[in-house]
């Protein structure tokens, strides 16, 4: 399994609960389409972190392999290119609902289970 990690802060006129709900709805859509296997949305507890400037939110998206991750990325990219049918329009709305509030300090990393099976 591959695990795509995202660390971010949120900004703008949205509550933490609204933002997390919007992100969850987007990721749930990708899971329902079998574009991802699972996901987690976590938040730093009590500000406890030893890495200076580590963003508050941590999102983990699990995929079977790089191919599935690429399919998920392409799904979102297609939505952003405005080649939309009705279902894609809903994905775009869900993506925009959380993504517009992600601060510029976003960080990404891709990890895998070790050792490879």
Mark where each language-model region is.
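An amphipathic, aromatic/His-enriched active-site/gating alpha helix that lines ligand/cofactor pockets
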Residues: 29-38, 52-54, 60-109, 116-117
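Short amphipathic alpha-helical segments
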Residues: 14-41
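Hydrophobic pocket/interface hotspot
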Residues: 6, 19, 23, 59, ...
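Short, flexible turn/loop "capping" segments at secondary-structure junctions
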Residues: 1-2, 50-53
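A broad, structure-centric signal for solvent-exposed, well-ordered loop/edge residues
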Residues: 17, 48-49, 70
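Structural beta->alpha junctions
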Residues: 10-13, 63-65
